[in-house]
Amino acid sequence: MKSAVWSNGWTVSPHKSVNAVEFACQYHKNKDVWDAAFRFLAEHDLEALSIGNHVIREGKCWATVSEYIPKEVEKGNIESHLRFVDLQYVLWGNEKMGLASDVDVRQAYNSKKDVAFYTSSRIKHHSADAGSFFLFFPSDIHQPSVRGKGELVKSRKIVIKIEYVD
């Protein structure tokens, strides 16, 4: 991860919470798709991208750009995905991302939406800013889009869905 060969010119680093071993495994198993995702981030003006979906590789990788007010921690969804890795990058705003443990299933996995929802009283939150991105693999039960400390402000985020390879 330190060599940043994977970055394809994008200068943002993975957050310290990212599972480096899983990242390396997935990158090598699906290199063309990961390279396309990182090239997309490096080659586009992320501030100018329109809100909505942007196809990177049909059925394998796409970006969703959104602007929103982050939720209070009690109202934020705790979720996981099996078919796609989440790359989440907050361009601006005041929010944090959580990694949950000791979870109970609230809503069973929906294969059409590639999501399961959980409850948990044990979530470790990390500040999200433009200096780093988060990767959430199928084993990472996460709580995105949670309001950070301080002023309640709008966030702009890009979520890239990247096909997970067993």
Where on the chain are the PLM-derived regions?
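N-terminal leader/capping segments at the start of a protein or of a new domain
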Residues: 1-50, 61
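A short glycine-rich, His/Asp/Glu-containing loop-to-beta-strand
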Residues: 51-72, 78-91, 99
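Short, conserved beta-strand element in jelly-roll/cupin
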Residues: 82-96, 101-104, 109-115, 161-162
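A short hydrophobic beta-strand segment most commonly corresponding to one strand
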Residues: 87, 133-135, 152-166
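Short, surface-exposed secondary-structure edge patches
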Residues: 87, 124-125, 149
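A short secondary-structure junction signal
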Residues: 99-102, 144-148
